[in-house]
Amino acid sequence: MGKIIAIANQKGGVGKTTTTINLAASLAAEGKHVLIVDADPQANSTSGYGIDPKQMTSSIYECLVDDYPVDGSQVPTCVEGLELLGSRIDLAGAEIELISRDNRESIMRRALATIKDKYDYILIDCSPSLGLITVNALTAADSVIIPVQAEYFALEGISKLLNTIRIIKSKLNRQLEIEGFLLTMYDARLRLANQIFEELKGHFGDMVFDSVIPRNIRLSEAPSHGLPALVYDPGSRGATSHIALAKELIMKHRRNYHAHGNVQPA
């Protein structure tokens, strides 16, 4: 059965979409079957793969609001083994349309349950808003990756997200865990960046990924070409850092799988 990971942080500009786009491509490059769910009305994960939201016949919006099946709504990407369930601006109005629905926080979980077995990993790119769609994503997820920008005020707002995760874990999704904190936009030359990394490690210990995502021009350029960094410039630090993250994530899941007495890695 696949693992559903939400990429979330209510602080904007920390690299959620960049992480989603490039971690997904890197997991696929490691031989995993991966689905991106773009749960942000800005649809940056969708356009970041060169897909025009206006040209899609269905999206996450139709799957949540109109009960379209997820299987058949996803589209292929330029990366073998990676598909995308796209988003569009209509999703911004979905919270109002879903407000009267029974069990409205669990609509995404029910939708993704129908295809979870088809994938090794499903990555959900969350909106910075902690509204109903993000609550749906966290209710559907097995775990959360929290990108943290290597800049001043980096830890600002994390306590609010952690409190939201605690509430969802207690009320809606008892299996929800924090997969890890990921330092993004890291510049090893800056003392502040290293201080933030040490501060994260001091607060959260082993929950902080060893892999860090550097500031990288090619990583910033790639989405405008509709490509992940791994395709746009495979040798760039932006690409290689996400490959390292994918390997770290896979190894972590393999260790956890064996620790529970299983024979084959997830």
Where are the language model's segments positioned?
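P-loop NTP-binding core
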Residues: 1-266
